[in-house]
Swiss-Prot record:
It comes from the Bacteria. Catalyzes a salvage reaction resulting in the formation of AMP, that is energically less costly than de novo synthesis. NCBIfam families: apt, PRK02304.1-3, PRK02304.1-5. This is Adenine phosphoribosyltransferase. GO terms for biological process: adenine salvage; AMP salvage; purine ribonucleoside salvage. It catalyses: AMP + diphosphate = 5-phospho-alpha-D-ribose 1-diphosphate + adenine.
């Protein structure tokens, strides 16, 4: 069974008209989780994307990013919600459909010139990914690529990210579904 078929669809969540793609059914399954980590590992061992560290976005990006960093022998840096990091931070606000939110990274988490693979579970609007990329750049890092389990191209996040000059990779997508 492929990755896509292991992802649960929940209609009208978190609000009416939204088809929520729930990856918990994928990652709770040891075969499904292995498919994800092996698929990403293969991508970064074989496709010449040069990077030094994996950055994962809270919360599901931590699950993927830390496992991927381990398999590739890289370090892992968390991008967190406000107030969760104990040392000096840099913040980035971003737009949500219903307001704004913010993410943070430790000021010393990434050295200038460090090449970063940014990882999260799902790409929809691109707001969180672009905010995380802005954080990486504020502390002097360079985003080599952004990787996701799921891309929802109909929502437009992939186009926004590509238009900003970033590379995007996803293991699967739900287009027109």
């Amino acid at each position: 069974m492929p990755i896509k078929s292991r992802i649960r669809a929940i209609p009208d969540y978190p609000k009416k008209g939204i088809m929520f793609r729930d990856i918990t059914t994928l990652i709770k399954d040891p075969v499904g989780f292995r498919l994800v980590i092996d698929g990403l590992t293969q991508r970064y061992l074989e496709n010449g994307v040069d990077f030094d560290v994996v950055v994962g976005v809270e919360a599901r990006g931590f699950i993927l990013g830390s496992a991927l960093a381990y398999t590739l022998g890289k370090g892992f840096v968390p991008v967190r919600k406000p107030g969760k990091l104990p040392a000096d931070v840099v913040s980035q606000e971003y737009e949500l459909e219903y307001g704004t939110d913010k993410v943070e990274i430790h000021l010393d988490a990434i050295l200038p010139g460090t090449r970063v693979l940014l990882v999260d579970d799902l790409l929809a609007t691109g707001g969180t990914a672009l905010a995380a990329a802005a954080l990486v750049e504020k502390v002097g890092g360079v985003v080599a690529e952004m990787a996701f389990i799921v891309n929802l191209p109909d929502i437009g996040g992939e186009r926004k990210i590509l238009d900003k000059g970033y590379r995007v990779f996803s293991l699967t997508e739900f287009e027109g579904e």
